[in-house]
Swiss-Prot record:
It is found in: Cytoplasm. Keywords: Cytoplasm, Gluconeogenesis, Glycolysis, Isomerase. Pathway: Carbohydrate biosynthesis; gluconeogenesis; Carbohydrate degradation; glycolysis; D-glyceraldehyde 3-phosphate and glycerone phosphate from D-glucose: step 2/4. This is Glucose-6-phosphate isomerase. It is an enzyme of class 5 (isomerase). It comes from Xanthobacter autotrophicus (strain ATCC BAA-1158 / Py2). It catalyses: alpha-D-glucose 6-phosphate = beta-D-fructose 6-phosphate.
Amino acid sequence: MTSNAHATDAAFKALAIAWTTREGRILDLFAQPDRFERFSVAYGDLLIDFSKTAITDDILSQLLELARAGGVEAQRDAMFAGDHINLTEDRAVLHTALRDQASDTIQVDGIDVKPGVVETLARLGDFATGVREGRIAGARGGVITDVVNIGIGGSDLGPAMVTLALAPYHDGPRCHFVSNVDSAHITDVLKGLDPATTLFIVASKTFTTVETMTNAATARAFIVNALGEDAVGAHFAAVSTALDKVGAFGIPADRIFGFWDWVGGRYSVWSAIGLPLMLAIGPDRFREFLAGAAAMDEHFRSAVLDQNLPVLLGLIGLWHRNACGFPSRAIIPYDQRLARLPAYLQQLDMESNGKSVTRDGAAVSRPTGPIVWGEPGTNAQHAFFQLLHQGTDIVPVEFLVGAQSHEPALKDHQDLLVANCLAQSEALMRGRTLEEATAQLRAKGISEDKVAEIAPHRVFPGDRPSLTIAYATLDPFTLGRIIALYEHRVFVEAAVWGINGFDQWGVELGKELATQFLPAVTGGALPPSASASTSGLIAHLDAVAGG
């Protein structure tokens, strides 16, 4: 074990002791009248309040020491410098270059990638503007009214999430997303679409992703059957680097937009993968989105650790995961247009940090990535908040809420939304004692026998941690900041855990086996290594399908 690893291990042990020996409850910490001021940090209008966690001054100091011991600053600087920090794939990690609006040059392996980034963004802008203005039209001259993005994973979750989030800024064609190879997905999306006014974007770096190419073939047939083979080029664009394969599909070179191997799929929404968003909101708004992320990048690089939002968010995550032993975190945006944010963050976090070996291939010595899940409020309150408040597992909650909505005429809705968000975080912390529950029931005139029967069911343990991310309005700039905040939070946690947060070998085995099992599903033989369970399931599915 290196000296750095020794320091990290010692810091984790000290934090675990701080948790197990703590006295009192989170609510008791508010005896300090300035707790909110000392345990919340703002960057412009974007504020993180973590005062409703069990973190104290001493614990925060230990967490900051953990960040230093884990080499967060050095690893951060290595990422921005273009070093190959993705060791298993021998790649740089520079999605930040896609939104960098300050640097004159960005070096990767001695090559300045800035001109290519600028050129690609300009090409995307020209194409999006042409479609939005009707100059780039369908094969029969029809203005494009609908765009269907076909991708999966990072080629779907990112653009789908941000396009929904920025719906108030849509002034271009309607955007739809197809990801699942389930025929129901593309069938339902294509219903009601006019082939003559529909543009498909096929997003696959290699142009070989099975789910994406299966859906792309169906979309191609949709166009060919209605408009003829010659119409394919006018109704498709591609985000890919496989020029030969894309050309063979029928998509002309001027409709192919590439990105680089130093951009991971779950970090690619800033690249040509974000084309659906640009078509929906326009190039200028898209640049505002990039600018928000760039601002958070600069904050991450320059802010001192105890005022650094991504660092603090990462350290809070490490505290809850490793010191407190909480295995999951819930993301609850009080904004319906952020409905896809929890799913997006599931991939960002769980695909990055769901690792069981360190960067050098040794087994990790402590739990790593948590289970990330959630739904928007207030819907979530009527679904799973029962467990959050009274269940046997403690789940740290991360609330997101804006001060203003995009519907000023419905301010009463926003007021109710904000009140619910604040009430839930307060209730999770405060709880309700048996004495309070008893007094509340007695005040209603209920008999003593009934009070004794019901009161235990109305007790809330409380002392359940949450943090709140608050901002003015969900606009393109703010959304960019929020996504980059979470990207860097995941980076901080991976750095301290000593894992590679930029590969995803865990997705490979299932894909390999699916290729082996497909012949058996279609009537052939299973490989000898398949289990009796798989054989039995195939036989049952074949029987009930009438095969």
